[in-house]
Structure formats: C-alpha cells, structure tokens
C-alpha cells in the first residue's frame, strides 16, 4: 500500500487530464464527426473520408498525440425527399497521453437526418446521434513507482503488480447534436450548430470509484462568403464547455481559386484561428479534385509558452469527398469547410 502512493498520484493526474482531453482539434472544421454528430453525411458527394493528426505540446514529454479517422455517407436517397439527407458514419480515435503512459481508443457510429425547410433546399435543420465504445489503458512501464527511487538513485525495477481491472477501463458513451444550414443564393453558406457529449455520464475510474464524466457542450458556427467570381472568405468559430473548463476558438481563411474554375477548382487557403488565452494558430490548406489537405501550428501565447517554448503543436487534416457520378446532379447546400 505504501508503494502505491506515487502510483495513485500519477493515475489521478492522468485521469483528470484525460477527461478534459476529448478530441480537441485546432482544425475543428476539418473533423466533422467529432465536432457535431449532426454533421454525419452532411456534404455534397457520395461518401467522405476524413483523417486528423495532432501532436500537442511536443516539448513536454509528448503530452498528447491524437489521431482520428472517419467515414460517412448519405443513404436512402431514393426513399426520402430530394432535398433531405439521411447520413450514417463510423469513426475511430486514438490518443496517447504522457508519452504513452495513458492510451485511449474508441470506435463510434453515427446517424443523422437533415430536413429541408424550403423547396429549393436552401435551408435545412438536422439532428444526429452518436454512440462510442471507449477503452483506456495505463502503460505502467511508463510510470515511476516509489520503490524505484532509493538513496542510491533510480533502480528502474519495481515490485508493483496490477490486476487487469486496475489498468484497463471500458465504457459506452452517447453524444447528440443539432445543426442549421442555410444560403441566400446558392453561393454563400452559413451554419450554426450545438452538440452535447457524454449524455449518459459514464463512470471513468481505474480504482472502481464513482467519478463520472461531465457532459461537454459545444456551440459552433461558420460562413462562406464569396469574393468576386471564384474566391471566398471562410469563417468558423467553436465554443466548448465542460464542468468549469471552457475553450473558445475563432478565425477564418481566405480561399484563392488558383485555376479560375468553379466546377473543378484548385483552391489555396490561408488564414489563422485564435484559441482564447492559449494560442495563435496559422492555417494553410489546399483543395484539388476530391481532396482537401490542411496544416496548422499552435503558437502558445499563454503562461504555458515558457515550458512549451511557444510550441503548442502541429496538426494535419485530410478529407476526401467522392463526387457524384452524374456531373449534372443537383448540388446540395452543405457547410463548406
């Protein structure tokens, strides 16, 4: 029991950090299924694949390395009204905290339905639901225990042993969201959504305690504003609340159509986002054919910049949207990220 003191302290620290570490991408707009379950299937195309990678605070023992991958598509198109969308999607998530001391993995599935509010499909409101199965695992080889520290230094050997239930944690989680999308002329676009996570308040404890996850609420919005015949401004904001923690991001990017082709554009994006009281995030993106690539870098502006050397972390996103086989198919009004 005496030797477990340092272990318990480490576990409590890891758990408290990890509960606040839901997927937290600076390019939130490039990770639709972690942003809002209602965005499942909400795109103009046949199917969509999205992948995200984030290495947060690399100078602090690789504090977090996060990866996600998702696939979603619209279904039953011949059985619902023309301007409605019924979406289904699947997602995987992996996060390593503390240089791999705590590993989190989940798999999820989502459903959404978007109801058109007018005959042109210019305005719609949608709802989505998501279920995930989470596994968290402690890698005790990455931890230091009391009996490894002696008057002669660090031994690297411990006599501590743990049952599987003490290093593995599993639970089911439920999320939901709503979103409104609209356009005034078929060229501009705007959206406003809200989502809630951990609706079932799952228990999360390695020592069979009664700690439950607090619900997390996010509010997001954005717009695409055409500039001239081919270019556009894109704005997006996201506000997240969980217990006493808050996270607010605002910013935008200018989209330059390099080839002056609206149907098959090659677009270059350049902009920046700001996470309040934390980081400035320059962003660069490239869209060509059915691919959209994004890269950003967090520059810490908070008190953490001394420990991180202002290096908040690099993030990369990749989205592939399969275009409809029929080039004359009606285009749907969807958020443009």
Region locations from a protein language model:
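Sec/Tat signal peptide C-region and signal peptidase I cleavage site
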Residues: 15-20
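Subset of outer-membrane beta-barrel
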Residues: 21-337
């Amino acid at each position: 029991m005496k030797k477990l003191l340092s272990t318990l302290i480490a576990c409590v620290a890891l758990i408290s950090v990890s509960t606040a570490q839901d997927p937290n991408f600076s390019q939130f707009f490039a990770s639709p299924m972690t942003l809002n379950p209602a965005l499942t299937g909400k795109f103009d195309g046949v199917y969509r694949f999205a992948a995200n990678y984030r290495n947060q605070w690399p100078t602090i023992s690789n504090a977090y390395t996060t990866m996600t991958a998702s696939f979603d598509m619209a279904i039953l198109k011949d059985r619902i009204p023309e301007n409605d969308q019924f979406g289904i999607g699947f997602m995987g998530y992996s996060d390593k905290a503390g240089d791999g001391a705590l590993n989190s993995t989940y798999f999820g599935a989502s459903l959404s339905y978007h109801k058109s509010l007018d005959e042109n499909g210019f305005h719609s409101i949608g709802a989505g639901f998501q279920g995930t199965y989470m596994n968290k695992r402690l890698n005790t080889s990455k931890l230091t225990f009391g009996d490894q520290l002696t008057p002669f230094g660090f031994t690297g050997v411990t006599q501590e042993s743990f049952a599987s239930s003490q290093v593995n944690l599993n639970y089911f989680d439920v999320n939901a969201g709503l979103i409104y999308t609209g356009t005034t002329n078929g060229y501009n676009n705007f959206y406003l959504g809200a989502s809630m996570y951990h609706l079932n308040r799952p228990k999360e404890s390695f020592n069979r305690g009664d700690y439950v996850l607090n619900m997390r609420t996010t509010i997001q919005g954005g717009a695409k504003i055409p500039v001239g015949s081919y270019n556009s401004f894109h704005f997006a904001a996201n506000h997240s609340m969980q217990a006493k923690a808050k996270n607010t991001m605002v910013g935008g990017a200018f989209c330059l159509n390099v080839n002056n082709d609206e149907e098959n554009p090659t677009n270059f994006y350049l902009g920046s986002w700001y996470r309040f009281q934390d980081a400035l995030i320059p962003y660069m993106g490239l869209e060509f054919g059915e691919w959209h690539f994004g890269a950003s870098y967090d520059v810490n502006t908070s008190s953490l910049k001394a420990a991180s050397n202002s290096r908040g972390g690099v993030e990369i996103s990749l989205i592939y949207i399969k275009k409809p086989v029929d080039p004359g198919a009606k285009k749907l009004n969807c958020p443009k990220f």
